[in-house]
Amino acid sequence: MILFITGATHTGKTRLAQKLMEKYKIPYFCQDHLKMGLIRSHYTDLTPDDDQELTDYLWPVTREMAKTAIENKQNMIIEGCYIPFDWQKDFDEEYLRNIRYICLCMSGRYIDNHFDHIRSFASCIENRLDDDYCTLQNVRNDNRMFLNGCIQNHLDYTLIDDDYESAISPLMHIL
């Protein structure tokens, strides 16, 4: 079983992946690690700010890792924001039967009411060396983009609108 966890910045993707790994003893792969490894080793001229280009660059590798794990009957959680909204087109039905998808989105109201709290969790799993881009407007825009992408592509999503833990709690039973 493959579990894709995606969503906007600061929605808790890595934290959820970590909690699921601990509960189910399933490894997780973080697309940010692949991104930074490729950037720091100069295998690409892309920068961490090149979101769409990074999706185009990282998705083929991520996709084939998922297929390989399914073929080997292995479970894996793949976490990151570089999973395209049309990801399903890249998998035959035999693969799709073995893939679950979670997209975390926060409502504008939630962001407005909890922005300081959101920022306080920014490094709860991984240390963010530079979090200057995490502004109220950027977080709102990023979440709106992910929510619209899910709606337009008929993908399920988890909307965090009131209480974070009550929105995330059901996802702990997805596998």
Residue ranges of model-derived segments:
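Conserved glycine(s) of the Walker
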Residues: G12
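Glycine-rich phosphate-binding loop used to anchor ATP phosphates in small-molecule kinases
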Residues: E53-M106
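NTP-dependent small-molecule kinase module
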Residues: R144-L175
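The conserved Walker
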Residues: T9
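Conserved Walker
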Residues: R15
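Hydrophobic anchor at the beta1->P-loop junction of P-loop NTPases
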Residues: I5
